[in-house]
Design a protein with these regions (language model features):
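C-terminal motif of bacterial Sec signal peptides marking the signal peptidase cleavage site
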Residues: 22-26
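Short helix-initiation/N-cap motifs at beta->coil->alpha
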Residues: 43-44, 64-78, 172-183
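Pocket-flanking alpha-helical
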Residues: 50, 70-104, 182-183, 203-208
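Short, well-ordered beta-strand elements
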Residues: 32-45, 63-68, 143-147, 246
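An extracytoplasmic/periplasmic, membrane-proximal ligand-sensing/linker region
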Residues: 45-48, 161-170, 175-189, 226, ...
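A bilobed periplasmic-binding-protein/Venus flytrap-type ligand-binding module shared by bacterial periplasmic
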Residues: 118-128, 225-238, 262
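Ligand-binding cleft/hinge of the Venus flytrap
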Residues: 53-62, 137-172, 279
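A conserved helix-loop-strand patch within extracytoplasmic ligand-binding domains
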Residues: 104-152
Length: 298
């Protein structure tokens, strides 16, 4: 039975991978220069600025835009094969370093959309430890578990390395971004101890009092970095206006936090909230749009 379950799990994961590629593949077929096919991961910040990019391109520049959610691996594959125009969320220099090294010859770095990322293990402020090296002394309070996200995420790979490096007596639990924040919500409501894989930017830091556990100086696996937008190799030639727009797109920490909280707290569709944010922050987006493109979109 265990073997059958493992086989079903493998087939299920393969099916999801094929489905993701199938959704992405062909997006760019028979679509013109005034089209954009953007891929993002189902993480709070990616959802926020990908939907923002969509409404700006549509409303201000007259584009036909398709956005597709996919796991990190299929997203890189899509732009490397030219089946999508851009992947909106590459974390460098650490989290996506392996993916970037694998695909860098077939993709183009369009620029930084957000500066100052931070990743690591996150706990509520009421948890009375401050360092990763203190986790084992309190493993029972955490039920010996670190609540993670989707398996293909770079933060999951690094956390597995960290468990070995610090010799932690913990299991890394695979879930998803939304499942992780739900677990965090339940724990905080009851003031239970919980440790999760966390990153900034993320709306959870605006909702709850949280802290990153400190790394030992000789065991630093996470560094601060930036979020880049990666494009297909020929994007600047085939769609120069789109490439220029994506290269100029940039959000500060307060701007992105404001957008993420607005999306998370609203019952409206993400696109509707992003459009309202765009209308309320015209001064932010004007810098991204060429004057002639802005006129064409009006």
């Amino acid at each position: 039975m265990k073997s059958d379950n493992k086989l079903l799990t493998m087939l299920s994961k393969l099916g999801v991978f094929v489905l993701a590629i199938g959704l992405i593949t062909g997006c760019t077929e028979q679509r013109g220069e005034k089209s954009a096919d953007l891929v993002y991961v189902n993480w709070a910040e990616g959802i926020a600025y990908t939907n923002l990019a969509k409404v700006v391109l549509e409303d201000k520049m007259g584009y036909d835009v398709e956005i597709t959610s996919a796991d990190v691996g299929p997203a890189y594959t899509a732009i490397a094969q030219g089946d999508a125009d851009a992947f909106m969320e590459t974390w460098l220099p650490v989290l996506h370093a392996d993916y970037y090294e694998q695909f860098k010859d077939d993709i183009v770095d369009l620029g930084i959309v957000y500066e100052g990322t931070q990743s690591g293990l996150v706990v509520p402020e009421y948890v009375t430890i401050d360092k990763i090296s203190e986790l084992n002394d309190h493993a029972d309070k955490f039920d010996g578990e670190i609540t993670g996200i989707d398996a293909g995420a770079g933060i999951m790979k690094t956390t597995n390395q960290l468990i070995e490096e610090y010799n932690l007596d913990f299991d890394l639990i695979q879930s998803s971004g939304p499942a992780m924040t739900s677990a965090l919500q339940r724990a905080i409501d009851d003031e239970d101890w919980i440790v999760v894989t966390g990153w900034k930017p993320h709306w959870k830091f605006g909702r709850w009092d949280l802290k990153f556990l400190e790394q030992d100086e000789d065991k630093v696996l996470w560094e601060k970095g930036n979020i880049h937008i990666m494009g297909r190799q020929d994007l600047a030639v085939e769609k120069p206006e789109l490439a220029n727009f994506l290269a100029k797109m940039h959000l500060t920490d307060p701007e992105l936090a404001d957008l993420m909280v607005a999306i998370n707290e609203s019952d409206e569709d993400n696109e509707v909230v992003a459009r309202q944010w765009m209308q309320d922050n015209e001064d932010v987006i004007e810098a991204w749009i060429p004057a002639d493109a802005q006129e064409a979109g009006m």
